[in-house]
Amino acid sequence: MKSTIFTPALNYLLRNDEKWCKAMGYFNPYLDPFKNHLRGSIPIYDLNSYRMYPNHNFVYDKLWVAQSQNLPAGELENLFTTTKKPNYPIFIKPRWGHLSAASKNCFKINNFDELSKYKHFKHMMWSEFVDGTEGMTDFIVLKGNIMHQITYKYSEKQNGFTDEYKYISSKTPTPKVISDWVTANLRDYTGIVNVQYRNNIIIEVGLRLARSGAYIIATDNHAILTNIYNVIDKNQWDYSLNDNMDFEPYYAFKCYTKMPIVYIWPQHILDLIVRSQTSRPFYEYYFEPVGREGMVFLQFMHDDLEKGMAIKKRIEFLFVLTQIITMILIVFTIVVLFSKWNCKYIFLIMMVLLYLTRFLNPHNTSYTLYKGQRQTIFGSGPPIGPEEITN
């Protein structure tokens, strides 16, 4: 994050976010609804995982991942100096997985003219464009042996590069080519491996659970969470728990909008909306830009696909309606300010106070929305490389 005059104040707010949430009575979706939790030294984020596993962090090199499968790929900058041209379309993205997130700086390129727009980008790679529905698997690995896996099945329909929902079940099998790749390339590894793929071609690998462990936590399964702790902190597996690692399947939905976001519901209003729709206790604001086309703004879970999709559409409609009403009120307030109405300043104060209720949320929620909007409007900027990261 670039330092500005607001950085100290922002850092203060983020450092004290937990105190703010407790004072305001905001629940923690990763802890409060569940009896069983992730514990011990399990890494949650990619950068932490990269540092925790120095002998296996080569998987964060997406170019190496592509080349390990004999997928046509290379460094982006080399395409501007070689006479050998790739077969379009190609896909370009940041090379280093621990230094990038979501779909930042990921583009489908159809010809050289489109490619030229990114000539100044460093630390990028290209590969053959792989079409098809995405899939993802979390592996629990002990000394190179896959002890357990949970595979996430993505919706066929997508908004840009993001799915509409995922189906999470302990019964969904992993494609054999994916598990074979993990076994072949991480022979002496112990920990978590998250693998994302399209048409059985691996596109990204991380040494941590998907979505900061949210999908595993939402199972509230004692056996799974205990054996994750056993593997990472004790270097062992409790086989007596194997018969208890099944869980009720569910769907994780992403709410998406193309409308500019000018207002978000206060946390307690969000609680009322979501809890009245689903009995699944995990939900959170989740801001994920989809290029410049729109943004994911919420994730929630449900046991039934049709009911969940209906809820998703209702929430998306309410959210768009909220943006429209907010925009109308902003325009109306500006018009009132230029009128001769005696109470216009009282009205202005009321409208400002009403608008500021959008900040009655965890500070991190407002910050992630700001980052997402900045990316949507201005782009991500060139990605960074390992030499630009300090401990």
Report the location of each language-model feature.
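Short loop/turn hinge sites at secondary-structure boundaries
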Residues: 37-41, 70, 79, 230-238, ...
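Hydrophobic alpha-helical transmembrane segments
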Residues: 338-350
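Active-site nucleotide/adenylate-binding loops and adjacent lid/helix of ATP-dependent enzymes
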Residues: 45-181, 312-315
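ATP-binding N-terminal substructure of ATP-dependent carboxylate-amine bond-forming enzymes
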Residues: 1-67, 306, 313-323, 357-383
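ATP-dependent carboxylate activation and anion-phosphoryl transfer catalytic cores
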Residues: 157, 172-341, 357-390
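Short, mixed-charge, low-aromatic patches
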Residues: 16-28, 131-140, 187
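Cytoplasmic C-terminal tails of single-pass
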Residues: 352-356
